[in-house]
Amino acid sequence: DVPPMRLSNLLRDQVRGRLAVARRAGGHETDAKLCVFYSKYAENSIHHLNGSPIDDYIPAFEKIIGRGYQIMLTGDSGRRDDLVQRFKGMVVNEEALSISRDLFNMYAATEADIFVGDNGGGAFLSSINTKHQLVMNSYPFLSSVPNAWIFHMWAHYEDGRPVPYDELATTYASYDPGHNIHVEPNDMDDILAAVEFFLDEIDAPSEGIGGSKLVLEWPTVSLFRMSN
């Protein structure tokens, strides 16, 4: 087996110790598992790959923390000091740990027990070591990452009708600005439901989910098929 990509023992011990200090400062004396959260959301952006607003993840954060995880904020969420203050040591960014952003991001991506967040570079980096990933707002529809639960963006025609699954897997599998569809990120309720399902699956894996035959509709050259 190929050994996991990790920081040096010295750097890992440094960050691990500061995570523990942050928990204790917030009144949390017990150890915690680690969740890396990645956001790809830019305020007022109309880009088709923009993720969900970070505030839409807050109920999910509460659920994740309730399951014993400390959350490391990466991506566009990293500057949200208000979330660090709100969750008292169970949500941290690089400023809270007084370390560089590069060190923070590399530790989070390579040491976390789980990943939760938007599709994008942060998800791909975390896939190197993380066994369980929940990737929200995946688009284009052919994209995927290994070992992940994938929740795609919502897609509908210009008249508001939802795009059928078989068309997402074929006609609209790749991004084309000429497509006559609109895509929208998952909302707060979608995210919370996805996180609850994800955490339950980690604790007690099911034998399978209905609709698995539909996966065969996806192009064989797609990342979605190759990662399953």
What annotation goes with each model-predicted range?
Residues 1-24, 148-228:
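Leloir-type glycosyltransferase catalytic cores
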Residues 1-6, 29-36, 140-143, 147-148:
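Conserved nucleotide-diphosphate donor binding/catalytic pocket of glycan-assembly enzymes
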Residues 32-43, 54-101, 211-223:
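Catalytic donor nucleotide-activated moiety binding site of glycosyltransferases and closely related
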Residues 47-50:
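Short, solvent-exposed loop/turn segments at secondary-structure boundaries
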Residues 52-60, 109, 191-193:
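Well-ordered, non-membrane alpha-helical segments in soluble/globular domains
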Residues 80, 87-94, 123-125, 131, ...:
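Polyanion-binding and phosphate-handling cores
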Residues 104-153:
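A donor-sugar binding/catalytic signature common to diverse glycosyltransferases
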